[in-house]
């Protein structure tokens, strides 16, 4: 009887001790599958970071996978981002045609319904009309026009946003190489003191001159190829200036590039300009150094477009030089 009680007691103690050891091991083992509170916090915020904007700090994905934007399609594509939605006129950008094959027109202003359908994890906008509504769909960054003032700032800004800083630097290196090649190709062809002007005619007959950071090929001509502005247009703060016909000779250049904003293709404003005595008497008109550029091609100012414009401008000048020698 005593032996049976002793055996029972020993067996019971072994079971109790085993249970206690298992319980202790479950709460203290460093290899336990259950995360600690700190680990849970890390897991919840994994893949997100803070990005400072004028509207405050926004939590965005470290590597966004699906981005919707209004006017920053080219900027984001230049650093390899996956753009799934853009505003409609971006599709007219000839430099982005192949890159936008999988993207959707999300309207302008951006349609919240169309944006929601794209399931973005990041939204980047130039205009902030629907900012609050868009912010409820995905983290939204408002980057106002003019935040970056040249191609280098632009590419690095959007490389940061897209989590692609290395690709941004690769793009810049390729851009610098192309710009250097373009300058080399123009040596001995273009007088180093020659001036180059960018002009635009509207369908209302208004004539404008542009600086180095307002599209129309400005960054390609002035920043990449290092060509000179007309002497009266050397003020950096004057990115656009409306000209009267009386002012035009003062702002004329040795080489002049004209784009025409004429959405209905009437052609009336251009005919009137070309028939004017002032236009006919310009040095560029007489010397055949006046170029008429496609609006959709040269209006663009994203990094991909600027890079493409370098080749177009160099080819234009080289061909023009050959023609003038005949």
Mark where each language-model region is.
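Bacterial Sec-exported substrate-binding components of ABC uptake systems
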Residues: 2-11, 22-69, 167-198, 266-269, ...
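Short helix-initiation/N-cap motifs at beta->coil->alpha
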Residues: 53, 104-112, 235-244
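A short, structured surface patch at a secondary-structure boundary
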Residues: 68-118
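Extracytoplasmic ligand-binding site segments that recognize negatively charged/polar headgroups
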Residues: 144-157, 193-219, 263-269
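Structured C-terminal subdomain patch of bacterial secreted/periplasmic proteins
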Residues: 255-326
């Amino acid at each position: 009887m005593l032996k049976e009680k002793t055996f029972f007691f020993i067996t019971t103690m072994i079971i109790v001790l085993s249970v206690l050891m298992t319980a202790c091991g479950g709460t203290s083992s460093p290899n336990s599958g259950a995360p600690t509170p700190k680990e849970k916090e890390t897991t919840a915020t994994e893949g997100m970071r803070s990005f400072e904007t004028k509207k405050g700090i926004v939590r965005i994905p470290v590597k966004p996978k699906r981005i919707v934007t209004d006017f920053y399609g080219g900027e984001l594509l230049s650093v390899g981002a996956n753009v799934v939605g853009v505003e409609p006129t971006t599709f007219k950008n000839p430099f982005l045609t192949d890159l936008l094959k999988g993207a959707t027109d999300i309207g302008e202003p951006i349609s919240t319904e169309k944006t929601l359908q794209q399931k973005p994890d990041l939204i980047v906008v130039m205009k902030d009309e629907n900012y609050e509504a868009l912010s409820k769909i995905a983290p939204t960054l408002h980057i106002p026009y003019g935040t970056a003032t040249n191609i280098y700032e632009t590419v690095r800004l959007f490389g940061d946003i897209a989590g692609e800083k290395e690709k941004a630097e690769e793009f810049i290196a390729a851009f610098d190489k192309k710009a250097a090649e373009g300058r080399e190709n123009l040596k001995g062809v273009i007088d180093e003191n020659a001036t180059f002007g960018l002009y635009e005619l509207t369908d209302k007959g208004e004539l404008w001159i542009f600086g180095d950071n307002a599209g129309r090929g400005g960054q390609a001509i002035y920043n990449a190829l290092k060509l000179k502005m007309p002497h009266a247009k050397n003020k950096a703060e004057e990115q656009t200036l409306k000209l009267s016909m009386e002012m035009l000779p003062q702002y004329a250049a040795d080489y002049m590039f004209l784009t025409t904003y004429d959405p209905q293709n009437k052609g009336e404003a251009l005919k009137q300009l070309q028939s004017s005595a002032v236009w006919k008497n310009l040095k560029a008109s007489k010397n055949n150094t006046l170029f008429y550029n496609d609006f959709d091609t040269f209006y663009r100012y994203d990094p991909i477009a600027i890079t493409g414009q370098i080749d177009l401008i160099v080819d234009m000048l080289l061909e023009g030089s050959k023609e003038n020698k005949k």
